[in-house]
Amino acid sequence: FTRPDDLAAKVIKHLVGSIKNFENKMVDDLIVGNAVPEAEQGMQMGRYISLLALSKEVPGMIINRYCGSGLEAIHLACARIHAGTANCIVAGGTESMSMVPMMGYKSALNYTISKEHPDYYLNMGLTAEELAKEYSITREMSDEFSLNSHQKAIHAIKKGFFKDEIVSIEVEETYINKE
């Protein structure tokens, strides 16, 4: 498997390498969002990514807002730049859903919340079902939205709209045969 910190570092190296006259020391901070910060994607993954992709002089941090973690990292970076506390921040998210089990390695639910609001601990699939009921979204509506989204993405890729944003990453493949 490719570790999420290695994956993010490869993307960041490509990003900064594609900017003319850019030096890593120009980066004031690295902010990485991650939904399940455990094991290979836990600890201080933001710092590790900075060490792998930028330099020891660039700090790095990890934030968590579950599925919105990467977007929140970008919001935080924009707010800091807008406030004048930074000029250049690399921000985004990284995750490896195959490296960490759902709910993490040790689920530690809050007893009071689990008794008073058990729905707070619904997984994303069940949350989607609840939201579909609440907002009257049918399966057909959801499928149509998904199809349209994929068609737009394919069209944009074919037209080259994301040629500078999509980075090819070569990974080592591992096959396990249980014969």
Model-assigned labels for residue ranges:
Residues 1-10, 21, 141-179:
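N-terminal extracellular/periplasmic Venus flytrap/periplasmic-binding protein-like
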Residues 2, 6, 34-87, 119-126:
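Conserved catalytic cysteine-centered active-site region
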Residues 5-20, 45-49, 73, 124-131, ...:
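Short, well-ordered amphipathic alpha-helical segments that serve as non-catalytic structural scaffolds
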Residues 11-28, 48-62, 76-89, 155-165:
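Structural signature of cysteine-dependent C-C bond-forming condensing enzymes
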Residues 34-35, 53, 92-94, 100, ...:
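Fold-independent oxyanion-binding glycine-rich loops
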Residues 38, 96-98, 153:
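Glycine-rich nucleotide phosphate-binding loop and flanking beta-alpha elements
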Residues 65-94, 132-162:
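Active-site-proximal alpha-helical scaffold in enzymes
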Residues 82-135:
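Flexible glycine-/small-residue-enriched beta->alpha junction loops
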